[in-house]
Amino acid sequence: FPPKFIWGTATAAHQVEGNCTNNWSEFEKGTKDGGQPNIKDNQQSGIACDHWNRYPEDIKLIKELEVSHYRFSVEWSKIQPQQGAFDEAVLSHYSKMIDTLIENNITPVLTLHHFTHPLWFERLGAFEKEENIPVFVSFCERVFKEYSGRVNLWCTINEPAVVATQGYFSGMFPPGKKDSQLSAVVLKNLLQAHVKVYHVLKKMENGQKVKIGLVKNINQFDPWRRWHLLDWMISNSVNHFYNDSTIDFLQTGIFKIRIPGLAWIYHKNMDAVNATDFFG
């Protein structure tokens, strides 16, 4: 690995903090149309590994690994339990955690949305509706105002294609829907949210000093039968939906998905061009 390669660890609030009340905690309690539980054996996150209370111990473990960075997400549902109401005690908690990281020479990398959001936002329609984007932007502004003086690396949204496909195509993530067109709309709205947040935060105090990026995982989809034309068409379509549409949008300002009979969407926003300081 090159000398400048960054080694670190990463978590998501819902996966480690415990006692979250959000779209995922609600989904964990639900059942599918056939009556089967959404989660195998009705497992629920519960207190998880209690990172909320045990973060000082966890940070010591990170330090023992001799890595330099820790990416974590802040839990929107805890920071803003009701629309328009921010919990100062929760904001203070994350502030102490950031200070502890810095004291241990670990660089904090803050993620603003990692799969979860408040139930009140879910009831508004979440990212199914473009008009809800300003609500997310407002949350991001408040968090950025609190921590931008100490946090230099910011991730807007974690893996938007996962949220869109697993939540709205396969139905394996909340809200458990299976609608390919809606999946494309949600992906478009998540990317629109990223672009808006990027530009708003860049105009705030410290905005030009920090780096703001999007977290995108790349999954390669190969044809089942390499000799079969239809399999190639399917794999190419899935690759474009999951990977290329996001990359193209940030390079050209054009978001385009065209899968006959499944999803058809075209959106242009030139503000998206280069609206990321890093991508990964």
Regions found by a protein language model. Give the residues of each.
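Glycine-rich, proline-tolerant flexible connector loops at the mouths of alpha/beta enzymes
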Residues: 74-88
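Catalytic domains of carbohydrate-active enzymes, especially glycoside hydrolases
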Residues: 54-75, 107, 274, 278
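A common structural microfeature
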Residues: 4-6, 52, 69
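Short, flexible active-site loop motifs that bind/organize anionic cofactors or intermediates
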Residues: 45, 52, 81-84, 126
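Aromatic- and Gly/Pro-rich amphipathic surface segment
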Residues: 25-60, 65
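Active-site region of glycoside hydrolase catalytic domains
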Residues: 1-39, 83, 91-280
